[in-house]
């Protein structure tokens, strides 16, 4: 149908309902354009797309309270035997989504490997599946969903605890909106809506 689907889509729809609003979506945007888009204003009020709250991003935009913990995951072909150590060599290609914390993690922790930043998560995971890439470093919630839905031949070789969390990005010019979003998120936690959405998409309350 062309309509966006996913955990974040269900989440923002539920948030909008709590606020008495309707959500409308911009056409697909590259991940690394989202924070600049919100900062400049005019096109979108909020961005929700698995955006990790980081010091650099907080300088540009405001964030709601976190709505999901997000560690990183190293995803490999099942039974490949690949590990963090085995990937840190010159002939290994490790994919990531451009501009993400996974992108940064590869640079810092797998400096010998060839980092391959891509715009599309599905293309990156398909590359791991076909052997084009040895691994992908990706947010664990995204990996959990994608491996369950589409990539049963892949597995998480390692979970990387990062202490990272997702938040909804909001322009610094709209503090009242951030406050209203926080209230809606808190209501969803207390009435079970958040738990239901997490269980629907991840199979459990991750």
What does each of the following model-derived ranges do?
Residues 27-31, 42-54, 77-78, 99-100, ...:
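Beta->alpha turn/N-cap motifs
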Residues 5, 86-100, 114:
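Short loop->beta-strand "edge-of-pocket" segments that line small-molecule binding or catalytic clefts
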Residues 20-22, 40-49, 92-93, 111, ...:
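Alpha-to-beta junction loops
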Residues 68-76, 140, 144-186, 204-206:
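Periplasmic-binding protein-like
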Residues 64-67, 76-94:
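Flexible hinge/capping segments at coil-to-helix
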Residues 9-18, 80, 93, 98-101, ...:
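Extended ligand-binding regions for polar small-molecule ligands
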Residues 9, 24-37, 81-82, 98, ...:
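Short helix-initiation/N-cap motifs at beta->coil->alpha
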Residues 1-50:
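Extracytoplasmic small-molecule ligand-binding "clamshell" domains
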């Amino acid at each position: 149908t062309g309509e966006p689907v996913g955990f974040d889509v269900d989440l923002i729809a539920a948030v909008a309902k709590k606020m008495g609003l309707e959500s409308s979506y911009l056409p697909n945007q590259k991940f690394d354009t989202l924070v600049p888009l919100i900062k400049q204003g005019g096109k979108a009020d909020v961005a929700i797309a698995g955006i990790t709250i980081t010091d650099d991003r907080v300088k540009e935009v405001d964030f709601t309270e976190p709505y999901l913990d997000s560690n990183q995951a190293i995803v490999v072909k099942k039974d490949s035997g690949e590990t963090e150590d085995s990937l840190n060599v010159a002939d290994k290609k490790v994919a990531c989504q451009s501009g993400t914390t996974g992108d940064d993690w590869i640079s810092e922790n797998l400096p010998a490997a060839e980092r391959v930043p891509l715009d599309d998560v599905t293309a990156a995971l398909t590359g791991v599946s076909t052997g084009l890439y040895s691994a992908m470093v990706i947010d664990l919630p995204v990996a959990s969903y994608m491996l369950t839905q589409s990539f049963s031949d892949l597995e998480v070789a390692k979970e990387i605890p990062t202490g990272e969390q997702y938040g909804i990005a909001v322009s610094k010019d709209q503090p009242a909106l951030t406050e209203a979003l926080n209230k809606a998120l808190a209501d969803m936690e207390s009435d079970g809506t958040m738990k239901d959405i997490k269980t629907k998409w991840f199979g459990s309350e991750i």
